[in-house]
Curated annotation (Swiss-Prot):
Induction summary: Not induced by bacterial challenge in larvae.
UniProt KW keywords: Disulfide bond, Lectin, Signal
Molecular function per GO: carbohydrate binding; pattern recognition receptor activity
Gene Ontology biological process terms from the UniProt entry: immune response
Official protein name in the record: Protein A16
Cysteines engaged in disulfide bonds, as pairs: C163-C177
Segment forming the signal sequence: 1-22
PROSITE patterns: C_TYPE_LECTIN_2
Gene Ontology CC entries for this record: external side of plasma membrane
Ranges where the C-type lectin domain occurs: 71-186
Pfam families (alphabetical): Lectin_C
Tissue distribution: Expressed in the gut of adults.
Organism: Anopheles gambiae
CDD domains, alphabetized: CLECT (cd00037)
Length: 192
C-alpha cells in the first residue's frame, strides 16, 4: 500500500513538473510592454477596425507569482496528520491552502517562534524542493514554482530529490523527498 501511494505521489509530481516546465518564466526580457505592441494604421485612427484587431496576434500568457495582488499571508500547522512531502503538499491543497513558502527573514523568524512554542519535537515540511531543477543546489517553491531566495547560506544541497523541512527550532534541514521514512507534519500558508 505504501509503495503504491509513493508511486502515485511520484507520478503526480512528474505530471505537475512536466506541466510547469512547459510554461515560460516571467522576466523583464519576455514580458511584452505596451509600447512594444505594433501600431497598425486604421481608416479612423481614433478606433481600431476589425481587421486591425485581428492583425494583432494574441500575446502569450505568463505565470505570475502567486502573491501578485495579495496583501497578507497566514501560516498554519496542517490539520490532516503527518505524511511525506507530497502528502503534505496535497493536504495543504485539500485544506484550501498551499505548502508554506518563506519569502523574508520576518517570515522565517515567525515560523521559528511558532515551532519553538509548539514543542512537538518534530520536523515540519515546507514547500522548498530541488525536484525538477537542472542544478541540484537550486531550490524552488513547489507551491509557486519560483526560485527560493531565502535559503540559508550554509545550506548546501547536493543530492537530487531533496525537500526541505524545518527543525523544531525552525532551522532548515535537508530530507529525501522519496524516502518513505520521512513522515512529518507540515506548515501551510494562505493569503487574505
Amino acid at each position: 500500500m505504501l509503495l503504491a501511494n509513493t508511486a502515485a505521489a511520484v507520478l503526480l509530481l512528474i505530471v505537475c513538473i512536466g506541466a510547469s516546465v512547459g510554461l515560460p518564466t516571467v522576466d523583464e526580457e519576455n514580458v511584452v510592454q505596451a509600447e512594444q505592441l505594433p501600431i497598425l494604421p486604421t481608416a479612423d485612427s481614433s478606433k481600431p477596425t476589425d481587421d486591425t484587431v485581428k492583425a494583432i496576434a494574441p500575446q502569450p500568457r505568463y505565470l505570475l507569482p502567486a502573491d501578485f495582488a495579495v496583501k497578507n499571508k497566514k501560516f498554519t500547522i496542517g490539520t490532516l496528520g503527518v505524511g511525506s512531502f507530497f502528502r503534505a503538499w496535497r493536504n495543504c491543497i485539500d485544506e484550501g491552502k498551499g505548502l508554506a513558502t518563506i519569502e523574508s527573514e520576518k517570515e522565517q523568524k515567525y515560523l521559528e517562534s511558532l515551532l519553538k512554542a509548539s514543542s512537538t519535537g518534530s520536523n515540519y515540511w515546507i514547500g522548498a524542493t530541488n525536484i525538477g531543477a537542472s542544478n541540484t543546489n537550486k531550490l524552488t517553491w513547489i507551491t509557486t514554482d519560483l526560485p527560493v531566495q531565502t535559503k540559508p547560506p550554509f545550506l548546501n544541497v547536493v543530492a537530487k530529490s531533496t525537500c526541505i523541512a524545518l527543525t523544531p527550532t525552525g532551522s532548515w534541514t535537508l530530507r529525501n523527498c522519496l524516502n518513505p521514512l520521512n513522515i512529518f507534519p507540515y506548515i501551510c500558508e494562505e493569503y487574505f
